[in-house]
Amino acid sequence: MTDSNKKIYVSDVTLRDGMHAIRHQYSLQSAVAIAQALDEAGVDSIEVAHGDGLAGSSFNYGFGAHTDLEWIEAVAATVKRAQVATLLLPGIGTVHDLRAAYDAGARVVRIATHCTEADISKQHIEYARSLGMDTVGFLMMSHMTSPEALAKQAKLMESYGAQCVYVVDSGVALNMRDVAERFDAFKAVLDPATQTGMHAHHNLSLGVANSIVALEHGCDRVDASLTGMGAGAGNAPLEVFIAAVDRMKLKHGCDVKQLIDAAEDIVRPLQERPVRVDRETLALGYAGVYSSFLRHTEAAAAKYGLSAFDIMVELGKRRMVGGQEDMIVDVALDMLKARELANQEAA
């Protein structure tokens, strides 16, 4: 059962995961407006970076409207209460990028790896701790390994110095039982002082439910975003999550009405593609595909005259993971070739 006396650490990701929804094009003005609203509403941290983390701006992932440091500096100069967080994927961002983000005002960092590759986070976690940052391990695509194996990876991150480790449902393939099993496995091996967190997506409409189940199984921190602004069908919608836990009489420290207003008045008008469950975003969850593949897959489908749904299902069959965005075009070309051969045989 959830401890009603325990304060939930509310981690907003509108200005990082939400970058995916608008192709990393937040203006500084929009970033400041969102950060100010979140800060006033009482969230604990506000994550800021390119959608793929520090140094993610690239041909492979898409170029940002601004640099990570420009966004971080703007938000850090705005907030009065919330901590500024950022994300780093080893192999994309470096310790030099992390130092620059720290100097720009970031005080929380989430070091993200694939769920079976925690060992590549050692250098970055140790460096973050040396800076005095609140250091979090972030195990992406957590559905792709067993609860026990995931817990071993979490234990590695803890051994490097991570103060919190997350179950990250990047592929949106976890149901409530899956979430419960992973947090129970974490609890069995992690030091009681090490916190745990949940990063949910909403492609199967389970973002809020999975986050609440995580809390029921000892989770300390929950990620969410205004309107669910994020990759795929988005993250757990922050305003919905807070409304739900408020009705449960759980401690969250946020103003529900302010979050609802910020979601509707500031964030929703920025969406060039509605962040919702639809044919394409549902396909991501159904196939267990990395949520940030959405916009890349839609572009490939339009270019080659294919179904985005079919491409995503094939990506799922091939067990593609984050960082393999370049393979989306390869898969599309394979499917195009197969269709042409089928047409020739039919003729």
Swiss-Prot record:
Name of one Pfam family that matches: DmpG_comm
Span of domain Pyruvate carboxyltransferase: 8-260
Gene Ontology molecular function terms on file: 2-isopropylmalate synthase activity; 4-hydroxy-2-oxovalerate aldolase activity; manganese ion binding
Keyword Manganese belongs to the record: yes
Disulfide-bond pairs as recorded: none
GO biological process annotation, one example: catabolic process
Site entry (Transition state stabilizer), positions: R16
Keyword terms of this UniProt record: Aromatic hydrocarbons catabolism, Lyase, Manganese, Metal-binding
E.C. number: 4.1.3.39
Protein name per Swiss-Prot or TrEMBL: 4-hydroxy-2-oxovalerate aldolase
